[in-house]
Swiss-Prot record:
One of its GO terms (molecular function) is FMN binding. One of its GO terms (biological process) is protein modification process. The gene is nrdI. Belongs to the NrdI family. Probably involved in ribonucleotide reductase function. SUPFAM superfamilies: Flavoproteins. The lineage of its organism: Bacteria, Bacillati, Actinomycetota, Actinomycetes, Mycobacteriales. NCBIfam families: nrdI. This is Protein NrdI. InterPro entries: Flavoprotein-like_sf, RNR_Ib_NrdI_bac, RNR_NrdI.
Amino acid sequence: MGNIVYFSSVSENTHRFVEKLELPATRIPILGRIQDPDFVREPYVLVLPTYGGGHANGPDPDAGGYVPKQVIAFLNNEHNRSLIRGVIAAGNTNFGAEFGYAGDVVSRKCGVPYLYRFELMGTTDDVLAVRAGLENFWKEQTCHPPSQLQSL
């Protein structure tokens, strides 16, 4: 099975969710730049929170602000971007159509599937669904390697 790369803010909601998955995971740091060129060495699924929300007319892809800056910097590295295979996003259902919208943005810009969205730190059902879904996803990836991904 592939790896998980994730970002969690100081709220730690995404971190708690990833811990409950009990799968190999690498955290994008909150502060500072990633210095290690081998920070990621294998294909991964990105798990991230959604920032912003509350736009009166729903999601505004041109407004930006949904994807944490640390994740943008991470994905702007061509090597890191070349290894992403899917995205899972956290969000808050109070934001309606913007719930988990960071996943929509990353999926569109990186040309990878949006696999799942969960609220805040997820439920037990979310953990079970993601674990099973990732197992199936990585089996499928092994059978059918992805084509070259687009640049951001």
